Regions:
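N-terminal Sec/ER secretory leader and immediately downstream segment
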Residues: 1-36
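Solvent-exposed, acidic/flexible segments
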Residues: 9-12, 16, 43, 79-86, ...
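A eukaryote-biased sequence property
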Residues: 24-25, 72, 166
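Extended, well-ordered protein cores
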Residues: 40-41, 45-47, 56, 60-82, ...
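Short solvent-exposed coil/turn linkers within tandem alpha-helical repeat scaffolds
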Residues: 48-56, 96-107, 149-159
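Flexible, glycine-rich surface segments
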Residues: 68-131
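A cross-kingdom marker for long, charged
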Residues: 118-119, 131-194
């Protein structure tokens, strides 16, 4: 069955509508990415129907994941959220991890934070860090992200990590930049993209 009609604003058959309804009643939904349609968990269903059985940290975590799934992050190897959202996600995880050190999904939270920080520091294929790599000229996305982080969260752990990196880029110190990326990778703060 071809489910692409749902996302192409084409008429949808009764069979597909019924299938969609059945999925929704059971906590799932149809989604699509780069033309492929797939089934995924409907996190709003989980929060709505099971929240009375959850701890406050679990509710907060699931609401955050639901928000991130709704907003997305990247499509076709390009970041699709605004710089402020990107930074706010990193800080949300930083604070959540600090405030919930025994949370059952703590490693998952650390992994999300690590991924978001990795892409903030190194870019992603179709949202590169530099508009001109030779001149080390920031893409506007990252210039905006770093300025927002430094201004809004001056006391955050993430800001302490990012500040020397940001300064090294502004001063075009390639060796320092490479050393910091290596150091952060070894410490497990970011993923290795090489």
């Amino acid at each position: 069955t071809d489910y692409s009609a749902i996302y192409m604003n084409e008429p949808v058959s009764k069979k597909i509508k019924d299938f969609q309804t059945h999925l929704q009643k059971n906590g799932f939904k149809l989604s699509s990415s780069e033309g492929a349609v797939y089934i995924e968990q409907d996190r709003s269903f989980v929060v709505k129907n099971l929240s009375t059985m959850m701890s406050e940290p679990m509710k907060a975590y699931l609401l955050q994941i639901q928000k991130e799934n709704r907003e997305g992050f990247s499509e076709d190897a390009a970041i699709t959220i605004k710089p402020k959202q990107h930074v706010d996600r990193i800080i949300w995880y930083e604070n959540f991890i600090k405030n919930n050190p025994t949370f059952v999904l703590l490693e998952n939270c650390k992994s999300y934070k690590k991924a978001y920080l990795t892409y903030l520091l190194q870019g992603i294929d179709n949202t590169p860090l530099y508009s001109d790599a030779e001149q080390m000229t920031f893409e506007l996305y990252y210039a905006t992200s770093f300025k927002y982080l430094l201004k809004t969260y001056p006391e955050a752990e993430t800001t302490l990590l990012v500040t020397p990196y940001y300064e090294a880029i502004k001063q075009k110190q390639k060796a320092t930049i490479n050393d910091l990326i290596k150091k952060y990778t070894i410490k497990g703060l970011i993923f290795s993209l090489n």
